């Protein structure tokens, strides 16, 4: 759930930033994060285990909120680059769903609309076992959207998995809205008016620096002259306007097997 088929090695480093901010020293966790940083992807199971270990270091605290709040544009990968170049929050959410559908052939997330708001939610049956994972994912998403669309990310409600904590104030203060727990469809409801608010004229002062930072991050993963990246870009630019940028079609266009393309992505 939460936009995750896999966790990128770069995204996992938000946990390291959290450790630095909290002044936490854990050789075991540091070693595991160092290993994760060298990998293109980290399994969801391994990420959950890292989060459980972090939670044990700070019992009773809203660790998921703290870790997710550390996200920066360089942690968001290619999807982050697409969201960064969206016109508003609504466009960003629809862009994500489009990418999810085209590349995986299915939408794990569900985007619904009514007169007051837009709700993005994911099915989740794991309850407490997935609570911190869900908190980190939703907090990171909101943090990123607030960085990109100041004034366009007003929330009406948030639902999370897991038991209700004794102190819900940190959650309500961060999200700025009522927060419920024990949900099997965790998600976020955005204000229907704010979500359509154009970002033109309301960009954060550091927007261009953020965009350059993201470009540099992508260049580190695949240099500007990388033939794979150039070929992928060419095929996507040709396929998306035709409404057919599916994983099989992109693989054929690049003369790769589906398995090879998935691994390279």
Write out the residue ranges for each language-model feature.
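A ubiquitous short alpha-helical element
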Residues: 1-3, 126, 217-221
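Solvent-exposed amphipathic alpha-helical surface segments
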Residues: 22, 61, 103, 148, ...
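Extended mid-to-C-terminal alpha-helical interaction segments
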Residues: 165-265
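N-terminal low-complexity or simple alpha-helical regulatory segments
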Residues: 1-118, 140
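N-terminal regulatory/effector-sensing and dimerization cores
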Residues: 74-194
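Short, well-ordered alpha-helical segments
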Residues: 9, 13, 90, 131-139, ...
């Amino acid at each position: 759930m939460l936009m995750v088929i896999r966790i990128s090695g770069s995204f996992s480093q938000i946990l390291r930033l959290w450790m630095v901010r909290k002044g936490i020293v854990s050789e075991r966790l540091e070693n595991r994060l160092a290993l994760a940083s060298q990998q293109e992807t980290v399994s969801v199971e391994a990420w959950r285990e890292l989060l459980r270990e972090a939670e044990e270091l700070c019992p009773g605290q809203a660790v998921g909120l703290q870790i997710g709040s550390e996200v920066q544009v360089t942690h968001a990968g290619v999807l982050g680059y697409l969201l960064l170049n969206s016109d508003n929050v609504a466009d960003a959410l629809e862009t994500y769903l489009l990418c999810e559908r085209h590349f995986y052939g299915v939408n794990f997330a569900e985007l619904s609309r009514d007169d007051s708001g837009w709700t993005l939610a994911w099915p989740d049956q794991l309850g407490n076992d997935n609570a911190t994972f869900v908190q980190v994912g939703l907090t990171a998403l909101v943090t990123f959207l607030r960085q990109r669309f100041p004034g366009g990310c007003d929330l009406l409600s948030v639902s999370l998995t897991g038991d209700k904590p004794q102190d819900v104030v940190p959650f309500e203060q961060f999200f700025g809205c009522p927060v419920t727990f024990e949900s099997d469809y965790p998600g976020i409801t955005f204000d229907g008016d704010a979500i359509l608010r154009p970002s033109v004229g309301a960009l954060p002062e550091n927007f261009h620096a953020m965009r350059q930072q993201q470009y540099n991050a992508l260049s580190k993963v695949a240099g500007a002259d990388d033939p794979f990246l150039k070929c992928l870009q060419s095929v996507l630019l040709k396929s998306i306007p035709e409404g057919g940028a599916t994983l099989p079609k992109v693989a054929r266009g690049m003369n790769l097997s589906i398995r090879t393309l998935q691994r390279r992505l």
